[in-house]
């Protein structure tokens, strides 16, 4: 799999207003009808040589970009298991540096290993570290008293010690090169993956979109007053259910400019080919409606959306053109 950037405005079959704002779409697939690799996965994915589930955002101070990916088994072992994540940063969206965390190596990965409690007895039996995402937490306090860190949340499975995928979180420092020992975010008694957290000004709560493995298919929502704890079970009567019994995952919620409502992108992967779709939600991230396909995306995987400036977009177009010469 290669990481690729669609440098064209993403066009939908309907709702043309999307094309004004969805300027940057980072995704991972075997082949793409346009553009060039944004980076070489074999260089940055040091465990398996492949990447998936890319989540990109700006640094907390606006001075650059950070990205986190699943180090995915799509090149070397080609097994379903994977063992770690990759943290990347860039000043220009073109040149990236990275660090890789192979969770099979255990506590040596984590900067607080001397004082933290390990969630596992044996890290060598880890089976999955999936779909990491980032949320800047200005109130997080490090052991040295410094405040502010990037909360990275993801699902993990260690079959030797737990029965199903559960959501965990670590904190990365401001250099985006160190992470803390994973802590359990919640356990609802069944498998959960592909969490997407946003803070909503409309109600002052954190909202999480998440896929439940088992039960009724769909993308569900849960809320909390706090970022890293207090997550109750998801709402059962208001969820992304347009696909019926077909399976969907990989949700990403975002807002358009000058609009307090939300859009939710997700993958419907039961069909062949898969569909990357976007639906609407109200300002409380509820009442999902009007799903449409994203046009021109083949073989979609779990991606993310980030608003960029006109200048950034033009720079990317120039870079894309130069690489194609």
Which residue stretches match the model-derived regions?
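Carbohydrate-active catalytic/glycan-binding domains of CAZyme proteins
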Residues: 1-325
């Amino acid at each position: 799999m290669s990481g690729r950037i669609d440098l064209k405005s993403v066009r939908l079959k309907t709702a043309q207003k999307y094309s004004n704002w969805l300027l940057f779409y980072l995704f991972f697939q075997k082949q793409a009808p346009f553009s060039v690799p944004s980076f070489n996965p074999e260089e940055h994915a040091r465990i398996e040589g492949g990447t998936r589930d890319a989540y990109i955002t700006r640094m907390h101070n606006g001075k650059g970009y950070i990205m986190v990916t699943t180090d995915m088994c799509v090149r070397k072992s080609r097994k379903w298991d994977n063992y770690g994540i990759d943290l990347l940063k860039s000043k220009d969206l073109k040149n990236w540096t990275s660090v890789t965390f192979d969770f099979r190596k255990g506590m040596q990965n984590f900067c607080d290993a001397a004082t933290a409690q390990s969630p596992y007895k044996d890290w060598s039996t880890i089976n999955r570290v999936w779909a990491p995402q980032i949320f800047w937490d200005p109130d997080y306090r490090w052991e040295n008293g410094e405040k502010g860190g990037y909360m990275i949340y993801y699902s993990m499975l260690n079959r030797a010690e737990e029965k199903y995928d559960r959501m965990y979180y670590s904190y990365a420092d401001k250099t985006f090169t160190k992470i803390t020992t994973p802590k359990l975010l919640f356990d609802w008694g069944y498998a959960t993956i592909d969490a997407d957290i946003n803070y909503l000004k409309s109600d002052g709560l954190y909202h999480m979109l998440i896929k439940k493995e088992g039960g009724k298919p769909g993308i569900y929502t849960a809320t909390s007053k706090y970022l890293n704890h207090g997550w109750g079970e998801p709402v059962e009567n208001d969820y992304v259910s347009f696909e019926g019994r077909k399976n969907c995952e990989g949700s990403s919620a975002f807002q358009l400019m000058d609009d307090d409502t939300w859009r939710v992108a997700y993958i419907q992967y039961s069909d062949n080919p898969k569909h990357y779709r976007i639906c609407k939600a109200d300002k409380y991230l509820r009442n999902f409606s009007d799903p449409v396909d994203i046009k021109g995306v083949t073989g979609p995987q779990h991606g993310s959306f980030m608003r960029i400036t006109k200048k950034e977009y033009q720079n990317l177009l120039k870079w894309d053109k130069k690489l194609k010469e």
